[in-house]
Every structure is written in structure tokens, then in C-alpha cells.
Amino acid sequence: MTIGESKTRIGEFFTDGGLGRHETFAPRYGWLKKGIDAVAKDPNIFKEDDAIVKLGVGKNMVRSIRSWCLAFKLITQGEDGFVPSMLGRKLLADDQGWDPYLEDDASLWLLHWQLFVPPFEAVSWPLAFNYCNLLNFNSNELKNIIYDAGQAYPSLARISPRTYQRDATCIISMYYDQEKKDSAITSPFVQLGLIHSSEDKSRVTFNIGFKYTLPPLIFAAACFSYIGHYLSKSRRTISLQQLIFGVNSPGIAYKLPETVAGQYLN
């Protein structure tokens, strides 16, 4: 598969992507564990009238939990409803899970990468990380960038600018806690430091540089995942440039410059 063919394949994944399904909520502490546990007990929990009681959240939050569990590839559609995915079981299961309560930053880095793995339940995330090259930006400017990028795909071009605006606002709030809110309503992904405040406090910037909490093994896993999803199985080699600058590459997802990525691979 050539680079051009790879881009075509990625474009097809973008075309099938979803927008605005998070109901304006970034993932909160405990939500993913709550969602996968509920699905393990009842595959149709998200359709149940008493889901708000069982999950202990509002109706819109029920839909948001469902969307984030799908976006992070923690649940998958089964014959009779949703079931925990292999990743969901291995990461969050009570008995054998690697990190059931997401206490290790490595787990958050692994989950963040899932947003760049098809299918895209939250397609604005890869659009933002791939196409926002501004030194700093606000939510309206980020909305314009992902909206313009979405116009290349007919299914995304039909989505209203208002939905893109909600996605842009959610992206920033997921990785940057401007108001220093209570931890119960803060996104755990703030810990990754992918978005920082700029000198102008009303604007933010992507943190492009070394990520002190990103384990080399997680970066390596993302590289293998990228190769598996986006490159031909006949390819025996891949350039460092493609791993860093290719659409939906680990370098793009983790905002790593080439020199830093080389250090991780060494």
C-alpha cells in the first residue's frame, strides 16, 4: 500500500466517523469503569429506562458514557447489545484488569491513542490533532479548523457548525482544565498535559515536546497499532517521518517532535 493509498483508506475511516455524540461532556473520573461494568451485567443497559438510576448519572450523561466507551474501544456491539471488548476486559476488569480505576497515566495514554484507531466515534479528535497547526487557538478557531477539514467528507459536511463547535469546546476541556474544577467533574486526560495555556490566558496551545509520563512501551504499541491499521501487511519497513507526521500517526496523536520520537524508539 502506497502513502496515497494509505491516505485514501484513512479518508474512508473519516467519512464513517461520528460527531457530537458525547453530549458536550468530556469523559469524567469513573465513567469508563462504570460503563464497562454496566455493560458486562446488562448488554442493553444504555437502552434501559432505569439506566440513569443504575449508572447514577443524568440521561445525557448515559449517552455520553456510551459514546466514550465506544470511542476508546472499551465496548463493542454484540449480537444482543454491547459487550466489553478485549481491551476493555484487559484494562478495566475487576479481577484481572491492568488498571481498573485508571490510576496509571500509561492507561490514559493508551486510551488516548484509541481515538486515532478506526472506527472513529469521535472523529473531531483526530481532525483536530491532525489539522490544527496554529501556535495557539481558542475553541472557535479550533471549530473552524475541524469544520473545514470535515468538508472534504460528504457525511461530515452535512453536520452543522454548531456540532463542530461543541466538539471543539469538548476537546479543549478534555485536556485542559482552565477553571481548576472539582476532580469529580474534571477529565482524567487533563493529566496528560497535551494542551496548555498560552501566554494569552484566553487561548491554549498543543504541548509539542517530550511527554514525561508517556512510557516508551505505550508509544511502541501505538506504532505497531498504526502500522496494523493504516499500512499494507506486505510493508516490511516504515520511515520515522511517517510515524511522526503521517495522518493519525503516533507522532500526531502524542504531539511529539521528530527528535523526541526518535528517543522513544531508541
Predicted regions and their residues:
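Donor-sugar nucleotide-binding helix/loop cap in glycosyltransferases
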Residues: 2-4, 8-266
